[in-house]
């Protein structure tokens, strides 16, 4: 009985070891934070049990679009065919072992395509994008390719190069599986439907490796060394250049009109001549990219000495202090509005905001001027001269009455003046008569 228990526990340990890479074993979660913070009680024995049931989230893999000699199944059979001394004297692995080997290599579809076919192939690029577009960028794909290539190269060095006869026999034994895989690959969606715009126009598809060549040809060795040495150099042919729209004739005319009044400082953003020559090379399909127009940043310098249309034309008069302050404020306000119009983009929203702001400033200034005029009128009325809280209606009524009384007094004084003038004329005439009589 104890032997059976120990055997069962040993089997459980082996099962756990076989699926251990799919569990989280790096980080420990705090299920009992209070106990761990107090550190008075040891952790419960059931804390680490639930971690055995946490599986790693794996992204879905797209099926291979390559068929024939470039398919991963051909790589699985041709590159990793077993030797006679590995399976205990048999000539080859069993059908289950071959299926497991093909399935394992299908997971690294991107790796198999990378060292069997040329990376400049358009189908290879689109296949990588379909597999990797919703998880990470091309740098992550290049890193994954370099890591898996290194592991497969080490495995091939340990196992040795297979003989072509055994590879051919392995290919014939697994023909049923290859037919199923090629049928699944033919049902895959064409990447050109999903990505209508080709990523590198200058790259032309190259043929795959011939069946007579070995799994690792010189081109694949050079690809492996270049991938391991410079992982950042791989995304360069896939770089998408940001294009700016070309300048039209209307834009150039507007720029010429603006140059008459403002100072334009242009900053051009140009690409290096090497990249432009590479991008300007003729493509295989005959498509050419539009020329990159320079990005121009403009900065306006508005002159402060502008013509004020509200000012008098030629004659210079001495205005009172209130009138002079009003004219100066009008000039400043006009300059501020001109600066805002030049600095802000020409859109309807900004123009409406500027008009509203200008109207508010002018209205506030008009009210202040009206208030000051009322205060000046109040100071001229004797009855309201010392009344600072007099309302505007009272000021207007008292001012009207005071004006009428002043006008009546003016008429009275004018009549008195006329009477005095007549009296003076009479006295002058009488004095003239007396002088004549005395003489």
Curated annotation (Swiss-Prot):
Residues recorded as bearing Phosphothreonine in the entry: 58, 315
Post-translational changes noted in the entry: Phosphorylated by PRKDC. Phosphorylation at Ser-329 by PIM2 leads to the stabilization of MYC. Phosphorylation at Ser-62 by CDK2 prevents Ras-induced senescence. Phosphorylated at Ser-62 by DYRK2; this primes the protein for subsequent phosphorylation by GSK3B at Thr-58. Phosphorylation at Thr-58 and Ser-62 by GSK3 is required for ubiquitination and degradation by the proteasome. Dephosphorylation at multiple sites by the PNUTS-PP1 complex promotes MYC stability by preventing ubiquitination by the SCF(FBXW7) complex.
Motif UBR5-degron, residue numbers: 355-364
UniProt key word 4Fe-4S: no
Residues with attached carbohydrate: 58
Modified positions (N6-acetyllysine) in chain numbering: 143, 148, 157, 275, 317, 323, 371
Motif 9aaTAD, residue range(s) on this chain: 100-108
Domain bHLH: 354-406
Biased composition (Acidic residues): 251-263
InterPro entries reported in the protein's UniProt record: bHLH_dom, HLH_DNA-bd_sf, Myc-LZ, Myc_transcription_factors, Tscrpt_reg_Myc, Tscrpt_reg_Myc_N
Top-level taxon in the UniProt lineage: Eukaryota
Keyword Transcription: yes
Residue spans of biased composition, Basic and acidic residues class: 266-278, 315-331
PROSITE patterns tied to this protein: BHLH
Region annotated Leucine-zipper, chain positions: 413-434
Phosphoserine PTM sites in chain numbering: 6, 62, 71, 81, 151, 159, 161, 293, 314, 329, 344, 347-348
Principal subcellular localisation of the protein: nucleus
Gene Ontology molecular function: DNA binding; DNA-binding transcription factor activity, RNA polymerase II-specific; E-box binding; protein dimerization activity; protein-containing complex binding
Low complexity bias locations: 210-237
Subunit structure: Efficient DNA binding requires dimerization with another bHLH protein. Binds DNA as a heterodimer with MAX. Interacts with TAF1C and SPAG9. Interacts with PARP10. Interacts with KDM5A and KDM5B. Interacts (when phosphorylated at Thr-58 and Ser-62) with FBXW7. Interacts with PIM2. Interacts with RIOX1. The heterodimer MYC:MAX interacts with ABI1; the interaction may enhance MYC:MAX transcriptional activity. Interacts with TRIM6. Interacts with NPM1; the binary complex is recruited to the promoter of MYC target genes and enhances their transcription.
PANTHER family to which the protein is assigned, alphabetical: MYC PROTO-ONCOGENE
Domain comment as written in the entry: The 9aaTAD motif is a transactivation domain present in a large number of yeast and animal transcription factors.
Role played: Transcription factor that binds DNA in a non-specific manner, yet also specifically recognizes the core sequence 5'-CAC[GA]TG-3'. Activates the transcription of growth-related genes. Binds to the VEGFA promoter, promoting VEGFA production and subsequent sprouting angiogenesis. Regulator of somatic reprogramming, controls self-renewal of embryonic stem cells. Functions with TAF6L to activate target gene expression through RNA polymerase II pause release.
Protein name: Myc proto-oncogene protein
Source organism of this protein record: Tupaia glis
Gene: MYC
